[in-house]
Amino acid sequence: MKKLLCLLLTLLLIPPALAEDALDVPDVSSLLPCANGALLAVSDLRVLRRDSAGDWALVLSAEQISAACPPRFMPDAANALLLPGENGAYALLLLPDTSGQIAVLSLTGATCELTRVFADFLPMNSEMTAQWTLLSAARAGNTLYAAFSSNFATYSTYALSLADGSSFLLSDAPMRFLMPLADGQLLACVNPPISSIDESCFALLDADSGESSRLCALPTHKAYAGFALDG
């Protein structure tokens, strides 16, 4: 009875629109604003779309997404990411699995038709059998940049070519946030584990060579989930 009363009180304190969204779309791992006020979301390996009226609809089922992935691919739905698409693509869906494989699916047209545009095992810089997690990703033209961490506290940031399917290791620093800039560089948040003696900082990362230059320090002993750039 106490649990039921707590749940009812919680729902009363949540604004109606937020409460409806929370009930309709549980466990959202990624959100992407789209044209006409629409919103795409990934939830439990499904792609959902909310229209301008606030109504949610299923766009792609888990079965459809799994069918578009390579054989024996085990998608890590909790770390799936949506990115804006180009050249007619409505959006890009990045699906990692814990072994270090990644698939990139293109969602095209009003029905979000699925096309696999990248799939590969990334050449991880560790000889140990690790469990990998996708931390951040960004797109610049036909190149995707994806930052991973492992359960052995190792890190890998890769450049993935959507044009020819190639990939290469860009950096082994703990990148928590990536944003492409117009001059061929990436704005990155280098955020080591809290136990590390290295300080967190913003840095500029060359998108071709991976060479970095430190911009400014961030408050220590903090973990950052995301940033926004204004100006």
Indicate where each model-derived feature is located.
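Hydrophobic core
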Residues: 9-13, 17
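Beta-strand-rich domains and repeat architectures in extracellular enzymes and scaffolds
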Residues: 22-45
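Repeated scaffold domains used in trafficking and secretory/extracellular systems
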Residues: 26-32, 67-84, 129-138, 173-182, ...
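Short coil/turn segments that connect the beta-strands within blades of beta-propeller domains
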Residues: 36-37, 87-89, 141-142, 183-184, ...
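Residue position within the beta-strands of beta-propeller blades
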Residues: 41, 91-93, 146-148, 188-189
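Structural motif
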Residues: 46-48, 99-105, 152-158, 195-203
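Short loop/turn segments that connect beta-strands within beta-propeller blades
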Residues: 51-54, 107-110, 161-165, 206-210
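Surface-exposed loop and turn segments in beta-propeller and other repeat-based domains
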Residues: 60-73, 115-129, 217-220
